[in-house]
């Protein structure tokens, strides 16, 4: 679903609503509840690495790097309402900027609850988000891969899932000179 659907939304907007796209914000809100203390909705190794790496967005022909979760703001999502949203690096921005050269600014926003972020900080602080191998009882293990093995399997979360998600694009540009 994501990435993918945001490319479809952008292509549709470019074809039917804009002559030039100037600003693109991809917004991703998971307002659901899987009733687990901590779980990721897709591969934990990828999810945790995405969130803990530096943010990256495109502005006026340059890629601008930020500290992880440094930039955030409250955005309002359809059928969900306002949620704190964090600027992240997401690979789909790179292809969208390349394929739509009139884009002046492109950003990716994702929501996280405070409880999720607290768990994430603890995971980082105790070294479980590390991707370099460590020695454990004479074996080399990667802490993040070990964590992935003990966390709930994302494919099994749907059964008890409640709530809504919202993924979309907020686009500004011009059509017929306006």
Predicted regions and their residues:
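Short alpha-helices
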Residues: 1-9, 14
């Amino acid at each position: 679903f994501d990435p993918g659907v945001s490319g479809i939304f952008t292509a549709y907007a470019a074809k039917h609503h804009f002559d030039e796209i100037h600003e693109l914000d991809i917004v991703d809100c998971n307002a659901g509840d899987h009733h687990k203390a901590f779980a990721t909705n897709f591969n934990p190794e990828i999810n945790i690495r995405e969130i803990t790496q530096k943010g990256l967005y495109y502005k006026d022909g340059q890629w601008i790097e930020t500290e992880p979760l440094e930039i955030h703001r409250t955005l309002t999502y359809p059928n969900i309402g306002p949620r704190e949203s964090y600027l992240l690096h997401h690979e789909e921005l790179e292809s969208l900027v390349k394929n739509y050269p009139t884009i002046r600014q492109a950003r990716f926003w994702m929501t996280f609850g405070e409880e999720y972020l607290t768990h994430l900080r603890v995971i980082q602080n105790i070294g479980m988000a590390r991707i370099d191998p460590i020695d454990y009882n004479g074996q080399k293990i990667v802490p993040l891969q070990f964590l992935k093995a003990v966390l709930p399997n994302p494919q099994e979360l749907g059964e008890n899932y409640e709530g809504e998600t919202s993924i979309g694009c907020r686009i500004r540009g011009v059509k017929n000179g306006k």
